[in-house]
């Protein structure tokens, strides 16, 4: 599946190159274990071109695996990303109990706002997206222990959880520091006016802005 430039990443990508964070091959060092080469608690964080910021939102019901509803990612090697909300069909709903549906409605109303059957791409596209991201990236960067576990089951890649870094602000605090323009939101959440706390595109924009600000700021 082709990816394309996200408007929400434009000014961040421009600043990424303008401030010389990546300036030729001398700034890129390959490591066998990217986890050991990335210190999220350091004042100056080295950014390598094979990292990918990623976030997911979805539905949970009982002990069922999470049904991923939305995925957003930004690949530092290409400065390109995408945001997709998946469309479930009757097959995904046929085994859901009344109790399951109650939980699904709770997620829609109080968590991410996305109705169960709404979507922009068929859920079958998820496997293609996983293969594309996996082929292009060496490490995934996200925030949240539970999310890191879920991503670890989907991808055969190291996962860096910025939530483990001491002093990493909450998304609400990040949104205060980095005001959210409309193009930071996916189209769905922009219309709903509910970017936080559960728009995947907004969250990776905020994480990327936060990491870049720590690199640009004085050591």
Language-model features: locations:
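Feature targets compositionally biased, intrinsically disordered low-complexity regions
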Residues: 7-9, 19, 23, 80, ...
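Proline-rich intrinsically disordered, low-complexity coils
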Residues: 2, 7, 40, 65, ...
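N-terminal accessory regions of nucleic-acid-interacting proteins
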Residues: 1-10, 14-56, 60, 83-106, ...
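Conserved non-catalytic scaffold segment of RNase H-like nuclease domains
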Residues: 64-143
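Metal-dependent phosphoesterase core characteristic of DEDDh/y 3'-5' exonuclease domains
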Residues: 81, 92-98, 131-219
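Generic intrinsically disordered, low-complexity segments enriched for polar/acidic and small residues
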Residues: 6, 13, 35, 104-107, ...
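Weak global preference for isoleucine
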Residues: 21, 28, 45, 54-56, ...
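Solvent-exposed, well-ordered amphipathic alpha-helical segments
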Residues: 47-52, 75-78, 154
């Amino acid at each position: 599946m082709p990816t394309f430039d996200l408007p929400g990443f434009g000014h961040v990508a421009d600043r990424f190159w303008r401030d010389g964070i990546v300036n030729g091959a001398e700034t890129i060092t390959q490591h066998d274990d990217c986890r050991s080469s990335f210190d999220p608690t350091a004042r100056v964080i080295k950014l390598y071109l094979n990292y990918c910021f990623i976030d997911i939102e979805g539905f949970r019901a009982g002990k069922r695996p999470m049904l991923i509803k939305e995925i957003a990612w930004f690949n530092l090697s290409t400065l390109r990303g995408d945001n997709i909300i998946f469309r479930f069909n009757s097959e995904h709903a046929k085994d859901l109990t009344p109790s399951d549906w109650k939980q699904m409605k709770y997620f829609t109303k109080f968590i991410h706002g996305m109705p169960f059957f709404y979507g922009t791409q068929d859920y079958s596209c998820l496997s293609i997206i996983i293969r594309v991201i996996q082929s292009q990236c060496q490490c995934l960067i996200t925030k949240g222990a539970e999310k890191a576990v879920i991503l670890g089951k989907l991808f055969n890649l190291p996962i860096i959880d910025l939530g483990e870094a001491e002093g990493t602000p909450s998304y609400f605090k990040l949104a205060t520091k980095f005001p959210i323009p409309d193009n930071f939101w996916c189209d769905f959440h922009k219309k709903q006016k509910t970017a936080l706390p559960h728009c995947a595109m907004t969250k990776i924009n905020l994480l990327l802005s936060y990491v870049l600000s720590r690199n640009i700021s004085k050591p």
